[in-house]
């Protein structure tokens, strides 16, 4: 009797998984994409309150983080797929946003270091006011029009000043409604009110957070911590049996979620 139940369980399970994988195969055939664990958009403040030396410290913080082989070896590579996609945007006033490094696949230490070199080659494009909402509005369609697919899409905003709370929160809410999973913040400076502003108006989505670098000199260490938190996968809460089915279930679940994300991206392109 137990053998019969086990056999029926396996048969039903494999039928379900096969159906899921078949649907995934048909979906991916219509929309070619590179699958990654996370799509991460880095939004870096270059408003007039940031001096040239402070801009260089910000830039160097990201360069050092992606140059560090530990980021890939102990964090990116530990994901289900072992890859991420990332871009970098400089932002300031309402009409001042620039994607200075386009969407890049990080699938090796070399790729991570090449991304660091690309950041290092960037120059400051402008230095006007501080409009966080417009930066988020600018970043969102770039996520939905890239050539990557993931289960987690994250926008990260770093800055040393606040902007209009209503427009900032509205941009955050619109990005989340469009399908972005989380918006995180990195506050530069030791201001409690600025931290609270980011916490209340910028941060949003499941697993989102705000970190604070008390000085620009602390920025590099905080960036490294932030990237690790954004990249690392959460451990599974349960361990189903038998083990041979775990991979099939995981792939099936990834396919279902990614298919939904893909539909959102296709709709955004129309």
Residue ranges of each PLM-predicted region?
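Extracytoplasmic/secreted cell-surface and envelope-processing proteins
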Residues: 50-54, 143, 163-170, 193-197, ...
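VWA/integrin I-like adhesion module and closely mimicked acidic/polar interface patches used
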Residues: 161-201
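Von Willebrand factor
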Residues: 34-100, 102-152, 154-158, 184-195, 218, ...
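C-terminal "exit" segments of structured domains
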Residues: 19, 206-238
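Sec-exported extracytoplasmic/periplasmic mature domains
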Residues: 63-71, 93, 124, 140-148, ...
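C-terminal membrane-anchoring or membrane-association module
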Residues: 256-270
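Short, threonine-centered small-residue motifs that mark membrane-proximal processing/anchoring sites
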Residues: 7-35, 229-250
């Amino acid at each position: 009797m137990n053998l019969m139940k086990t056999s029926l369980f396996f048969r039903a399970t494999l039928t379900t998984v096969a159906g899921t994988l078949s649907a995934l195969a048909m979906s991916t055939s219509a929309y070619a994409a590179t699958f990654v664990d996370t799509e991460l958009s880095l939004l870096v403040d270059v408003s007039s309150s940031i001096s040239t030396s402070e801009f260089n410290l910000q830039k160097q913080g990201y360069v050092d983080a992606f140059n560090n082989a530990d980021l890939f070896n102990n964090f990116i590579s530990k994901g289900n797929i072992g890859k991420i996609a990332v871009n970098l945007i400089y932002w300031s006033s309402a009409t001042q946003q620039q994607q200075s490094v386009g969407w890049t696949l990080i699938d090796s230490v070399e790729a991570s270091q090449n991304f660091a070199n690309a950041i290092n080659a960037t120059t400051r494009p402008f230095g006007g006011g501080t409009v966080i909402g417009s930066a988020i509005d600018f970043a969102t369609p770039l996520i939905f029009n890239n050539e990557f697919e993931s289960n987690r899409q994250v926008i990260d905003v770093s800055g040393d000043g606040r902007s209009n709370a209503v427009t900032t929160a509205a941009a955050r809410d619109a990005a989340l409604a469009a399908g972005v999973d989380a918006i995180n913040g990195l506050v530069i400076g030791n201001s409690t009110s600025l931290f609270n502003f980011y916490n209340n108006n910028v941060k949003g989505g499941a697993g989102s957070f705000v970190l604070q670098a008390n000085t620009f000199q602390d920025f590099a260490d905080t960036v490294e911590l932030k990237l690790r938190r954004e990249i690392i996968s959460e451990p599974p809460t349960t361990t189903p049996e038998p083990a041979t089915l775990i991979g099939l279930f995981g792939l099936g679940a990834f396919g279902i979620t990614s298919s939904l994300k893909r539909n959102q991206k296709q709709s955004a392109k129309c």
